[in-house]
Regions:
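Glycine-rich phosphate-binding loops of nucleotide-dependent enzymes
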Residues: 3-6, 29-288
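N-terminal acidic, proline/glycine-rich, low-complexity intrinsically disordered segments
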Residues: 1-21
Length: 288
């Protein structure tokens, strides 16, 4: 049997044709990557149908025309706990802030039960059932714990006592120290106050930006337990975390962001066991 070598597949002794061959391989790889990305985008949009909150193709940043997010997608269904991990500067917090109307969205949309909420202010989103806890311990230090809770419910102060009781069910310490000034609390306790205050408006979805940041390992574990308990009350939670391994242990689904794009997505368990995710992200992020 005779074998004929294709004319365009030259050996290393023909550098010109070899360069053409390498260029074709690069082009084919780019086309395959683009096709895979397009397929994954369609799958994501199909899965996102009926989601409580959805971000579609977000290009967003802190200034008009300057993007930190580059076609980022995310969805969370009723009752889900969704995590966002990735290296520093990947756009994790920016994605959360884009959902809450705190950064400029240049292209794309944010939807809440299929209603476009892209251009709504933060206070309007709170009224629609979206809560947000920023990364810093956002408490009023000169106010008592109880007064901080009142600030959380100022838009709708009805039934304050009943709402506060629900918060105390999750964070018993807040009830025991309700008359104590927030400025005298530890970092972990302040984080509980911040989350409790966001819950006073009884949100349908709660956005948490690195709630374990700056806490000791023991307090981090407590925060993650509380986050899961909040979710188990029926609140949809989207959490950004630098402690990637711990985050993936509690979430239903996760997103890995890199350079403002979705690098990987899957269940928490699948991402935690994915060799590429482990190699590229979990090895360093687990220590952060």
């Amino acid at each position: 049997m005779n074998y004929t070598k294709p004319a365009d597949l030259s050996g290393p002794d023909d550098p010109d044709n070899a360069h053409v061959f390498e260029t074709e391989l690069d082009t084919n790889a780019e086309q395959l990557a683009a096709s895979h990305a397009a397929t994954m985008e369609q799958v994501h949009k199909s899965e996102a149908v009926g989601a409580l909150v959805r971000a579609d193709g977000l290009y967003a940043g802190y200034f008009p025309g300057v993007n930190i997010l580059n076609s980022s997608d995310l969805y969370a269904k009723d009752g889900e706990l969704v995590g966002i991990i990735g290296p520093n500067g990947a756009g994790k917090s920016t994605l959360l802030k884009a959902i809450f109307g705190l950064v400029h969205i240049n292209t794309g949309a944010v939807l809440l039960r299929d209603e476009d909420i892209t251009n709504l202010r933060a206070d309007q989103l709170v009224r629609r059932g979206v809560g947000f806890v920023p990364q810093t311990n956002n408490v009023f230090p000169s106010l008592t714990i109880e007064e901080n809770m009142e600030m959380g419910a100022f838009q709708d102060p009805k039934n304050f006592s009943a709402r506060f009781d629900k918060v105390v069910d999750l964070f018993p310490t807040l009830g025991e120290r309700r008359k104590q000034r927030a400025g005298s609390l530890s970092g972990g306790e302040r984080q509980m106050v911040a989350m409790g205050r966001a819950l006073m408006m009884e949100p349908n979805v709660l956005l948490l930006d690195e709630p374990s940041a700056g806490l000791s390992p023991a307090l981090q574990d407590e925060v993650f337990v509380r986050v899961r308990e909040i979710n188990q009350t029926g609140v949809t939670v989207i959490i950004v975390e630098q402690n990637a391994r711990r985050c993936l242990q509690i979430v239903d689904r996760g997103y890995v962001l890199d350079q403002g794009k979705n690098a990987y997505t899957g269940t928490g368990k699948d991402l935690a066991n994915d060799p590429k995710v482990i190699e590229l992200y979990l090895g360093t992020l687990a220590q952060a």
